[in-house]
Amino acid sequence: GGVYACAIVALIDCAEYYDPSFYSDSLGTTFWRLWNYTGSYYDSNNSAQGYTNNDKLCSGFKQYMSTRGQAIQTYEQSAPTWMQYKTNADNWNMSLFCAGIIDTTTGMRSGHTMSVQGYALLEPIGVPNEEIKVLGVHDGWNTYARYLNFYFSNYTDTYGAFFG
C-alpha cells in the first residue's frame, strides 16, 4: 500500500502545469516533497489516508515551486467566488477547489480538494434564462475531467487556492 492525499494530487496537477522540468523527478519524489512542504499528515485511523490543511496549500506549493526554480504568485480564500475561478482560468492559470460535505454514512464532515482547469456555463433544456456554473476539475480518482456544480447547495464550506 501507499498513501493518498487529494490535495497533494491536485498540487501535482498544478506542478506539472507550471514546472517545465516537472518530469525530471519521479512522481513519488514530487508527492513526498509536496506532502512535506504542505505539512500533510496521516489519518490516525487510516494510515493510507492523508490530510492537508487548506491554509497550507499556497505556502507549501510556493515553497515547492521555488525549489524547482519557479516563482509563482498565490492567494487563497475561504468561500471563494465564481468570478475568482473564472478570472483565473481565463488568464490560463490553475487553482484548487476545496469543499466540505456531510458524509451520509458517518454524519461527519468530509472534505475533498481538486485542481481546477476550466469552467463551463450550462443551460438546462426547457429552463429559459437558467444557467448552471460548473468547474472543470480533476477529481483525483479519474483520468478525465469532471464537472462540478459550483453552487451545489450541500457544501458545508469551500476554500480556494489560486496560482499564477
State where each predicted segment sits.
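Compositionally biased, low-complexity linear motifs
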Residues: 22-23, 92-94, 110
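Active-site signature of cysteine proteases
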Residues: 98-164
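Short, well-ordered alpha-helical scaffold segments within catalytic/effector domains
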Residues: 58, 82-83, 113
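Loop/turn elements at helix/coil->beta-strand transitions in domains of secreted/extracellular proteins
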Residues: 60, 65-73, 90-97, 131-133, ...
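Short, Φ-rich (hydrophobic/aromatic) sequence segments
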Residues: 34, 87-91
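Cysteine-nucleophile protease catalytic domains, especially the papain-like/related folds used
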Residues: 2-77
